[in-house]
Amino acid sequence: MADRRLQVFHTVARLLSFTKAAESLHMTQPAVTFQVRQLEEYFNTRLFDRTHNRISLTEAGQRVYGFSDRIFELYSEMENAVRDMTGEISGVLVMGASTTIAEYMLPALLGDFKKKYPDVNVHLRVSNSDGIVSMVENNDIDLGVVEAPVMNKNLVVEECRKDRLVAIVSPLHALAANRQVQVGELMSDAFIVREEGSGTREVIQDYLTELGMNVADLHVIMELGSPEAIKGAVEAGMGVSIVSEVTIHKELQLGTLVALELDPPIERLFSFVHQKQKFRQRAMDELLEFARTYCLSHQDDD
C-alpha cells in the first residue's frame, strides 16, 4: 500500500547498503538501485552520496528518511487500528532463534500459537545468538529469542525463562557414577564445545572467567554447530561437554548420556529481543504476548 520507492529507499537508508537492502527485501540489487533512482528523479536531487564502495545520506536524504520513518509508523498505526475494528489477526511474521531454542523450545510454542491464530504464518530462521541479534538489528526478523546477553541498548530485551547447563559424559566415563562435578575435574578430558558466537559457548566462557579459567584452558578437540552434533560425539565416547539441560531429556531416558550437575551451577536466561518500534503488526503483538505467557507457564519444566 505504501509507495514502493519509499519502502526501498527507507531500507537502503537504514542499512546503508544496497546489497543488504536487496537481501532484506528479496529483490535484486539492480532493482533496488532502480527504485532509489526513481525516487531521486521524483525529488530531482541525490539522496545518497556514493564513495569508495560506501554510501551515506545527503542532507536531502536525511530529510526524506526522517519523514519516511514517520510515514511508516503512521501506516502501521492505521493498519493496526483497522484490524482492531475488524478483529482480524493475520499476516506473516519472521521469527529468529538460536539453535538450542529453535530445536527444543519453539516447536511447542509455535504449534500452540498456530492453533490459536491460524491466519498468522510464522517463518523461523535459525542461527547462533550473535546471528539472531544481528538479524534483529537489521530488521530482517520481527522477534528473536536468544540464550546469551544482548549488548545493544537500542533493542528491547525481555527475560523469558531460566535455563540450566550441565556437564554430559558417556555412561562409560569414570565420573558417570557421580551426581555432581566441578569443572576442574574435567580439565584433562577431551572437550567438545559449540562454535564462536554461540550463546552456550559465551555463557560457558563467562562461567570459566568467574572461576579464573578460560576456554583455552580446556582440552578442546572439536567445535560443533549444534546440540545434536555435540550429544552424538559425547555418546560415541569422543569426549565430554557442557550443554543445556533441556536438550538431553531423551538421552537421559534412554541411558545413552549421563548428566552431572556443575558445582557451582551454571544458569542463563532465554530472552526475547526486538526493535523498539512504537507501532507493530497486531500479529506481532499477539505473538509477543503469547510467548510471554508461554514462558511463565513453563518456568518449572526443568
Predicted regions and their residues:
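Short helix-boundary/capping micro-motifs
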Residues: H10-T28
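A short LG(V/I)-centered, amphipathic sequence patch enriched
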Residues: E40-L57
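Central regulatory/effector-binding core of bacterial HTH transcription factors
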Residues: S90-K153
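Hydrophobic hinge/microswitch elements
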Residues: N128-V133, E137-I141, V146-E147, T209-L257
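Secondary-structure junction motif
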Residues: F191-G212, Q281-R282, H298-Q299
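A late-sequence structural motif
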Residues: V258-D301
